[in-house]
Amino acid sequence: MATDRRVSRVSSLIKREVSQMLLHGIKDDRVGAGMVSITDVDVSGDLQHAKIFVSIYGTEQAKAETMEGLKSSVGFVRRELGQRIRLRRTPEVVFLEDTSLERGDRTLHLLNQLQDARKEEDEYIEPAQDD
């Protein structure tokens, strides 16, 4: 088992290298269908598995196409990681869609709606007290 510090360093290296591959290395047109950014990389303690969380901006169709393109390029990404990062074994790579940004945006929107509703309620109650 690798130390937490080592896992963190490998995770950040994978994130940096895969980001570079998204910009310059992956030639699949489906990957360019939506704007892709890597939000997080989760590497297992034995450095054998890497979950790469991606956030995709665009329509639902563009998101689906982009995920298909990323999943089909897993072999290329793993081979490139093996060449760019010096590890005994190159981790198995899995791309997962990260929807946390969308959930956070939706939550903020709901909180803002509640705040606006409370302001309207307070404004409605205050004039009634003046009578």
UniProtKB/Swiss-Prot annotation:
Keywords: Cytoplasm, Ribosome biogenesis
Keyword Transmembrane: no
A single GO molecular function term of this UniProt record: ribosomal small subunit binding
GO CC field: cytosol
Subcellular localization: Cytoplasm
Alphabetized InterPro entries for the sequence: KH_dom-like_a/b, RbfA, RbfA_dom_sf, Ribosome-bd_factorA_CS
GO BP: any one term: maturation of SSU-rRNA
Functional note: One of several proteins that assist in the late maturation steps of the functional core of the 30S ribosomal subunit. Associates with free 30S ribosomal subunits (but not with 30S subunits that are part of 70S ribosomes or polysomes). Required for efficient processing of 16S rRNA. May interact with the 5'-terminal helix region of 16S rRNA.
HAMAP family: RbfA (MF_00003)
Subunit structure, interactors included: Monomer. Binds 30S ribosomal subunits, but not 50S ribosomal subunits or 70S ribosomes.
Family membership noted in the UniProt record: Belongs to the RbfA family.
Protein name: Ribosome-binding factor A
Native source organism of the sequence: Gloeothece citriformis (strain PCC 7424) (Cyanothece sp. (strain PCC 7424))
